From Swiss-Prot:
<feature type="binding site">
    <location>
        <position position="79"/>
    </location>
    <ligand>
        <name>a ganglioside GM3 (d18:1(4E))</name>
    </ligand>
</feature>
<feature type="binding site">
    <location>
        <position position="83"/>
    </location>
    <ligand>
        <name>a ganglioside GM3 (d18:1(4E))</name>
    </ligand>
</feature>
<comment type="function">
    <text>May be involved in glycolipids transfer.</text>
</comment>
<keyword id="KW-0445">Lipid transport</keyword>
<dbReference type="GO" id="GO:0120013">
    <property type="term" value="F:lipid transfer activity"/>
</dbReference>
<dbReference type="InterPro" id="IPR036497">
    <property type="entry name" value="GLTP_sf"/>
</dbReference>
<dbReference type="Pfam" id="PF08718">
    <property type="entry name" value="GLTP"/>
</dbReference>
<keyword id="KW-0813">Transport</keyword>
<feature type="binding site">
    <location>
        <position position="165"/>
    </location>
    <ligand>
        <name>a ganglioside GM3 (d18:1(4E))</name>
    </ligand>
</feature>
<dbReference type="InterPro" id="IPR014830">
    <property type="entry name" value="Glycolipid_transfer_prot_dom"/>
</dbReference>
<dbReference type="GO" id="GO:0005737">
    <property type="term" value="C:cytoplasm"/>
</dbReference>
<feature type="binding site">
    <location>
        <position position="126"/>
    </location>
    <ligand>
        <name>a ganglioside GM3 (d18:1(4E))</name>
    </ligand>
</feature>
<protein>
    <recommendedName>
        <fullName>Glycolipid transfer protein 3</fullName>
    </recommendedName>
</protein>
<comment type="similarity">
    <text>Belongs to the GLTP family.</text>
</comment>
Amino acid sequence: MKRKRCEMEETTKKKKMTEIGSAIEELSVLSIAKTTIVTTEKEAINIINLPLKPLLSFCNIIVQVLDKIGPTMAVLRHDIDQNIQRLEKMWESDPLVYSNLVEILRKEAKEGSSRKPKSCSRAALWLTRAMDFTLALLQRLVKDMSQNMEQAIEECYNLTIKPWHGWISSAAFKVALKLVPNNNTFINVLAAKDETHQMVQDDITSLISLLIPLLSQLHSILELYEVSKLKSP
């Protein structure tokens, strides 16, 4: 009976889990409590462990959040999907070796393939930029839950993605920007049933605290392997 009750409680918990809650859960698995900046490959190999599967699971959650923003984020969403698939394919080729993202970046740097259009290094870079956008948007939301969503999304895009996007992608984003939902609609679809805006705000704050050190570490690794400034091919 006790086991059955525990199973029912777990099922209920899963049903109540929001995208924000799922994101917190995935980032908690990564266990990056503080920022570690590396400057040499030896440090990257010996100190940094970036488990690939939880990282990709988190990126899949970003896709779900972007879906709630609507067609405006279609270009970014498509890019994220493709980049996740590229890294998953590499992982599937040797799950033991490529369970750590650093090993993938190291392999391509050694082969001289990091800068190729379909490299896994580029995939990791663009996923990092998608996370940069997500962090910027969450920080704006937690600061002011009543702000204009269209303006917030445009400013976050201009800051994190636009400098690296080609003009076609930037133009497509600009056209779709008018389809952004208002802030109340967006917050409500992020919330669980009976969850207040304050509760959502608290969850977002928790997520931000996990995302900041992860992104600092990712940028450090990307800079080390000299792929951090690559633009769209």
